[in-house]
């Protein structure tokens, strides 16, 4: 829309940020966990490089060089990526060049290619949604198209009715701070949360019958602890394999089960599931890697 992304203007803030790393940092607290402070302290480049070299040599001496992985982020040129891959082969690991795309949005493209043959990113009608459930998508930090997202955010958060936002992530960030509800989740457990949300929608009869279909007699048989359901008892419309999915995976994935895995309270999972199912139109965002 003829606007420039504000990231360029804000770049100076990164340069002069008092918390910006100016060199190597070493962790001094060996204990790890959500409530542990790592206690990083600055060290010299000589100490940092010698430490890394010693650990790499120790792995190779034990015949375990394959346990080393080298990950790099966005912005590396082709020559840099090639150098990293060569380093991995010389060292003796197949994990020597794990790039940004491997851990970010390319997973969504590959998933879409398997599902519908479209090897591209999703497009969303942000302007007309009334509910957004965001799974670690970094909507206000880096989600594409970033400039458009900032513009549409102002619209959806000031229109009537105001778009309600629930954000799921592993750390406090801009999107979490701006959302109506923040769910801080244990890393890598997004799937458990999604299953529990779906479980609530099915057991409470909140699914979209015009799109999904319904039981032939209109009686909801999605119940906790229910026996295996028969696919022929359900008139399925635009989805495929719902009953099989329930039988194999979904029937025991309660919010109580998910709470132990995700660290998100059972009551919060139930509330989000109900909001998502009853606020129309609604959308679920993901893409930039699992949280």
Regions found by a protein language model. Name each.
Residues 183, 187-291:
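Domain-level signature for respiratory redox metalloenzymes
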Residues 1-207, 218, 257, 265-268:
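N-terminal export/assembly segments and adjacent metallocofactor-ligating motifs
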